[in-house]
């Protein structure tokens, strides 16, 4: 049984977090972001009942998978550091605590639901390709889910709610799509078309290893674009 002091501390903490949640930093269709009770951190709290990835008995809460994927990106310097995950009975109110990066990062673009373009899009797709090589597929990269370093323009990826692990042909396709979209953003549409078609032809023929070889060669070229 928890000691009375622990229960009181937990109650007071939830009261502070509830007050912070009433003044959110940002809201989306599936979550709300607000200041943590720990200075320098923020909370991302799901606004739906988290019944796991597939909603089956015994499924781990989806928030755990999301935090694990974000942690991979954070280790690569592409996402905020994950400080912790909290889950609650019935999957209601599950949340991720992470570093608040707003002091050094900013949004780009006039339309929150628009997508990165030009150099920003090249850099975002370079990161998506690096994540693909780590076996991570990250989607939903609209302007509200990407911040940029105020000094260097380096992207910082937010929101790993629409993401997953990939391997085999799916990993190749994920890498190829990120690379092709990066080429297109750099104004190399013809290169993107030929590259994508080549990789997909190999995949359709069952040549996964050769397709990955070509995908990596193209991505290496994308990485050289500044």
Language model features: what each stretch is:
Residues 35-39, 100, 149:
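Active-site beta-strand termini and strand-to-loop segments that position acidic
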Residues 136, 149-226:
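C-lobe/activation-segment region of protein kinase-like
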Residues 4-38:
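ATP-binding glycine-rich phosphate-binding loop
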Residues 41, 78, 96, 154-156:
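Protein kinase-like catalytic core scaffold
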Residues 71, 77-122:
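Conserved structural core of kinase catalytic domains
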């Amino acid at each position: 049984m928890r000691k009375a002091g622990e229960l009181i501390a937990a109650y007071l903490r939830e009261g502070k977090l509830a007050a912070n949640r009433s003044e959110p930093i940002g809201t989306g269709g599936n979550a709300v972001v607000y200041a943590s009770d720990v200075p320098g951190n923020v909370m991302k709290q799901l606004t739906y009942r988290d019944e796991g990835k597939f909603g089956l008995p015994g499924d781990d809460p989806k928030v755990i998978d999301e935090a694990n994927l974000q942690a991979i990106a954070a280790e690569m310097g592409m996402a905020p550091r994950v400080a912790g995950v909290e889950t609650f009975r019935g999957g209601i109110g599950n949340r991720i605590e992470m570093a608040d990066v707003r002091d050094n990062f900013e949004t780009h673009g006039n339309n929150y639901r628009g997508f990165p373009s030009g150099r920003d899009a090249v850099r975002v797709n370079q990161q998506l390709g690096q994540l693909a090589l780590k076996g991570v597929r990250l989607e939903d990269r609209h302007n509200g889910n990407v911040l940029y370093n105020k000094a260097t323009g380096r992207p910082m990826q937010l929101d790993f709610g629409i993401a997953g692990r990939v391997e085999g042909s799916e990993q190749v396709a994920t890498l190829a799509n990120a690379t092709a979209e990066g080429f297109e953003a750099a104004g190399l549409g013809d290169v993107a078309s030929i590259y994508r078609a080549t990789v997909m032809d190999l995949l359709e023929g069952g040549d996964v290893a050769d397709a990955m070889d070509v995908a990596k060669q193209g991505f290496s070229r994308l990485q050289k674009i500044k």
